[in-house]
Amino acid sequence: MATPALISETEAWKDLKAHLEGIKRTHLRELMGDTERCQSMMVEFDNIFLDYSRQQASPDTINKLYKLAEAAHLKQKIDRMYNGDHINSTENRSVLHVALRAPRNSAICSDGKNVVPDVWNVLDKIKDFSERVRNGSWVGATGKELKDVIAVGIGGSFLGPLFVHTALQTDPEASKNARGRELRFLANVDPIDAARNISGLNPETTLVVVVSKTFTTAETMLNARTLREWISSALGVAAVAKHMVAVSTNLPLVEKFGIDPNNAFAFWDWVGGRYSVCSAVGVLPLSLQYGFAVVEKFLQGAHNIDQHFSSAPFEKNIPVLLGLLSVWNVSFLGYPARAILPYSQALEKLAPHIQQVSMESNGKGVSIDGLPLPFESGEIDFGEPGTNGQHSFYQLIHQGRVIPCDFIGVVKSQQPVYLKGEVVNNHDELMSNFFAQPDALAYGKTPEELKKENVSEHLIPHKTFTGNRPCLSILLPTLDAYRIGQLLAIYEHRVAVQGFVWGINSFDQWGVELGKSLATQVRKQLHASRVKGEPVEEGFNFSTKTLLTRYLQATTDVPADPSTLLPNI
């Protein structure tokens, strides 16, 4: 019998569809009353505790999801990824971000070559360079130590490293290592972002890390040229080689730019941008800020989850369980979004990073073979740390649209605070909300309960909570570099599981190309209008032509061939 072309054509998918109606009729109040069920939906690995008992699912649902995973050949697809097969078929590439955090003595191959030695050559180079910068043996053009770093990149070259940086800022070991140092990220081509990044910094003490694999990324290279001008106008052109380094494989363009190619740190085609935080893209700026030893612990944490993901049975495999539950919520229950709600301010940049990892990976409308998908796939990811989110969008989550939620809690705060006379300490106050919110979503509050509380009749509809809103809880013991690495890898692999089950390519991103190509046409028109005074004519629809003309008419003061003007803030 031929293998179905789409996962939705399998008996396992059809079985889940038939099972769906019974689950829809069962409220979480009833499901949560079954202690045995709840116990079966709790998993622990390396002191990370996952409780998914508040999902709209029975043990039978979970077993059917395992059968769906089997029908999708999930285990074989995971193995193919780890074996270096070209699972990114549209670009004919391996997908080996797991190799970036593999121990030195590991063997992970791409096209028959063990790539781990290459990874460690770069890591050793980063360790040596970052230690020389940090101990003052590598100095700037005027002999001053380089205490400030601006990492220039966009997308995966920015969001992942920013997440890890923000998470480490208040970790005791990391913050001690970073004392007197500053790390900033320049991503947006908007000149305001450049202005904010250089504000308060001295070119003499600043090192710029330019992150672009090809050294041709339009936004990144314009920002890099802006910072090159900032440095050279203050210190002279020769200073660029002392104040700028690159994460790139295009050494001729790196050298042409003015950066010593010996100060270029490589990464490879088998590393996708959104999965590159464990490469030089993230490791270099983070090591400059926190020291290589701290970043190495982060890599070890990610590797720990890599091993768990590749070896644990599905019923104990945290990324697999999370991925299967997401498929259930999106493709069967019809919930298009997911809220990522970390009850730790240190994780404030987790949701924006996972937003990219998830939505760029799985925001696809066709299968890996190019067939249109007859079911919903991909999630709209967003989030905010608790308790801030409670005073922002939780209203909708409780009484508006149903949005499955990930609650992430940490047992021990990075920065505990105790105040004499308070009922609970600050972290306990935070965690009180972490434990309460999932129950509020699951159970809700009925009109009958409100009547017993003597709530006015006219307010009862407004104060009723339907409940039956799915969520899950992840409890981490601490939030140090190792645990941050684990959390990152859990979410990376969760996204892969979803894509493997849906049968899509989670590792390309053709959807970003069309807008970029259209921007090229606009850029040419802006140049022609500024330099030659040409009106906006052919090639644009009426709406775009109107907007462009309005923009140009309002900016006639912009010189056609300006002298250099840098931000002044």
From Swiss-Prot:
<protein>
    <recommendedName>
        <fullName>Glucose-6-phosphate isomerase, cytosolic 2A</fullName>
        <ecNumber>5.3.1.9</ecNumber>
    </recommendedName>
</protein>
<dbReference type="GO" id="GO:0006094">
    <property type="term" value="P:gluconeogenesis"/>
</dbReference>
<keyword id="KW-0312">Gluconeogenesis</keyword>
<dbReference type="InterPro" id="IPR023096">
    <property type="entry name" value="G6P_Isomerase_C"/>
</dbReference>
<dbReference type="InterPro" id="IPR018189">
    <property type="entry name" value="Phosphoglucose_isomerase_CS"/>
</dbReference>
<feature type="active site">
    <location>
        <position position="516"/>
    </location>
</feature>
<dbReference type="GO" id="GO:0006096">
    <property type="term" value="P:glycolytic process"/>
</dbReference>
<dbReference type="GO" id="GO:0051156">
    <property type="term" value="P:glucose 6-phosphate metabolic process"/>
</dbReference>
<dbReference type="InterPro" id="IPR035476">
    <property type="entry name" value="SIS_PGI_1"/>
</dbReference>
<dbReference type="GO" id="GO:0048029">
    <property type="term" value="F:monosaccharide binding"/>
</dbReference>
<dbReference type="InterPro" id="IPR046348">
    <property type="entry name" value="SIS_dom_sf"/>
</dbReference>
<keyword id="KW-0963">Cytoplasm</keyword>
<comment type="pathway">
    <text>Carbohydrate degradation; glycolysis; D-glyceraldehyde 3-phosphate and glycerone phosphate from D-glucose: step 2/4.</text>
</comment>
<keyword id="KW-0413">Isomerase</keyword>
<dbReference type="InterPro" id="IPR001672">
    <property type="entry name" value="G6P_Isomerase"/>
</dbReference>
<keyword id="KW-0324">Glycolysis</keyword>
<dbReference type="GO" id="GO:0005829">
    <property type="term" value="C:cytosol"/>
</dbReference>
<feature type="active site">
    <location>
        <position position="391"/>
    </location>
</feature>
<dbReference type="Pfam" id="PF00342">
    <property type="entry name" value="PGI"/>
</dbReference>
<feature type="active site" description="Proton donor">
    <location>
        <position position="360"/>
    </location>
</feature>
<dbReference type="GO" id="GO:0097367">
    <property type="term" value="F:carbohydrate derivative binding"/>
</dbReference>
<comment type="similarity">
    <text>Belongs to the GPI family.</text>
</comment>
<dbReference type="InterPro" id="IPR035482">
    <property type="entry name" value="SIS_PGI_2"/>
</dbReference>
<comment type="subunit">
    <text>Homodimer.</text>
</comment>
<dbReference type="GO" id="GO:0004347">
    <property type="term" value="F:glucose-6-phosphate isomerase activity"/>
</dbReference>
